[in-house]
């Protein structure tokens, strides 16, 4: 009798005689899937959030979002990147550009006049005279203004000349003046007084000098011109008018595409301990303005009062040799 159905294949095993096929229909999973054990109740009670309401830092910062780590206690607001602010905004008094950062005030050491603590941690000062547009266009002499910076470009002081209009335009560069030096809060920390003196080497009895007061009204030193037929020389004195250091300049003070150095020397003039440099500012600035740039270098451990006296020497040198008023040409020599 012929067998019907699919042909047998050698690869498939022959079912046993009592093979009943599949054991009934596939029962599927053992009963319906129970799912989670009861409905999900969520967290046990409402999430309490941080312990107590977070007030956030002082200022417009709204505080962290839920789940965001709490900033450290010293956090005082930040920039968009979230980093703490390293420098607090400082008061920009009139006349000073607002974009220049101020140097942070260090702790004042003992026996340091108030306001001079900035000078205890630096060995270099940059003095930049500001360009006055009215003076450039009309030749009308205005009060000089200076930015005083450290080697990092941070502003340490701001200096403003306080002289009446008649004195500025009649006496020119030989004029007496009061220079007020302000800190980042606009407080006057130093006052420089230059009396009216003769500017010719033919009268050695009435030479130039400037008094440095810190705080205002309390002299801390003097810069006295020393007579010499060829060289510009100055003596730096302390508050008791005792000689401490000397400043010696070149024979011909000509700023032609190079810096001019006035060396800071010991009293015997044997060793050089620093210098005051008139820096070349470029042809256009040198030719059409009297806005000069200076660099002052001194030992880091120099007495802070003598550092202030060196700053006064820089201003006296500027007025004596590099100040131009009205239609006068900038001086190219010592006398």
Swiss-Prot record:
Annotated transmembrane regions: 306-322
Keyword DNA-binding on entry: yes
Membrane-protein topology: Single-pass type II membrane protein; Lipid-anchor
Chain residue ranges for the region called Disordered: 1-102
Entry comment on modification after translation: Phosphorylated on tyrosine residues. Phosphorylated by OXSR1 in the presence of RELT. Phosphorylation at Thr-178 by PKC/PKCD increases its phospholipid scramblase activity during both cell stimulation and apoptosis. Palmitoylation is required for its phospholipid scramblase activity. Palmitoylation regulates its localization to the cell membrane or the nucleus; trafficking to the cell membrane is dependent upon palmitoylation whereas in the absence of palmitoylation, localizes to the nucleus.
One GO MF term: calcium ion binding
List of residues that carry Phosphothreonine: 178
Motif residue range(s): SH3-binding 2: 101-109
The protein's required cofactors: Ca(2+); Mg(2+); Zn(2+)
UniProtKB keywords: Calcium, Cell membrane, Cytoplasm, DNA-binding, Hydrolase, Lipid transport, Lipoprotein, Membrane, Nuclease, Nucleus, Palmitate, Phosphoprotein, Repeat, SH3-binding, Transmembrane, Transmembrane helix, Transport
Main location class: membrane
Role description: Catalyzes calcium-induced ATP-independent rapid bidirectional and non-specific distribution of phospholipids (lipid scrambling or lipid flip-flop) between the inner and outer leaflet of the plasma membrane resulting in collapse of the phospholipid asymmetry which leads to phosphatidylserine externalization on the cell surface. Mediates calcium-dependent phosphatidylserine externalization and apoptosis in neurons via its association with TRPC5.
PANTHER family: PHOSPHOLIPID SCRAMBLASE 1, PHOSPHOLIPID SCRAMBLASE-RELATED
Family: Belongs to the phospholipid scramblase family.
Protein name as annotated: Phospholipid scramblase 1
């Amino acid at each position: 009798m012929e067998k019907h159905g699919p042909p047998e294949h050698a690869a498939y095993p022959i079912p046993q005689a009592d093979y009943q096929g599949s054991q009934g229909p596939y029962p599927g999973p053992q009963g319906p899937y129970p799912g989670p054990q009861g409905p999900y109740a969520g967290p046990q009670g409402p999430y309490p959030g941080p312990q107590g309401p977070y007030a956030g830092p002082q200022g417009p910062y709204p505080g962290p979002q839920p789940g965001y780590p709490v900033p450290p206690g010293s956090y005082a607001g930040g920039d968009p990147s979230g980093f703490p602010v390293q420098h607090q905004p400082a008061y920009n008094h009139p006349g000073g550009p607002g974009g220049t950062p101020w140097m942070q005030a260090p702790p004042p050491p003992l026996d340091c006049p108030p306001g001079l603590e900035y000078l205890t941690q630096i060995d270099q000062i940059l003095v930049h005279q500001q360009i006055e547009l009215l003076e450039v266009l009309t030749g009308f002499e205005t009060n000089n203004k200076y930015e005083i910076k450290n080697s990092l470009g941070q502003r340490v002081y701001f200096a403003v000349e306080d002289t009446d209009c008649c004195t500025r335009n009649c006496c020119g560069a030989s004029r007496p003046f009061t220079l007020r030096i302000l800190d980042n809060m606009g407080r006057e920390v130093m006052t420089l007084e230059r009396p009216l003196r003769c500017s010719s080497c033919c009268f050695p009895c009435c030479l130039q000098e400037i008094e440095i007061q810190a705080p205002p009204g309390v002299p801390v030193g003097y810069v006295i011109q020393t007579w010499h037929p060829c060289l510009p020389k100055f003596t730096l004195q302390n508050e008791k008018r005792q000689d401490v250091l000397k400043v010696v300049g070149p024979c011909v003070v000509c700023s032609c595409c190079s810096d001019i150095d006035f060396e800071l020397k010991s009293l015997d003039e044997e060793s050089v301990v620093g210098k005051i440099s008139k820096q070349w500012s470029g042809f256009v600035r040198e030719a059409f303005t009297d806005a000069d740039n200076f660099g002052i270098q001194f030992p880091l451990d120099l007495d802070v009062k003598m550092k202030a006296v060196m700053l006064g020497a820089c201003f006296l040198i500027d007025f004596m040799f590099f100040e131009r008023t009205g239609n006068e040409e900038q001086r190219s020599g010592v006398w």
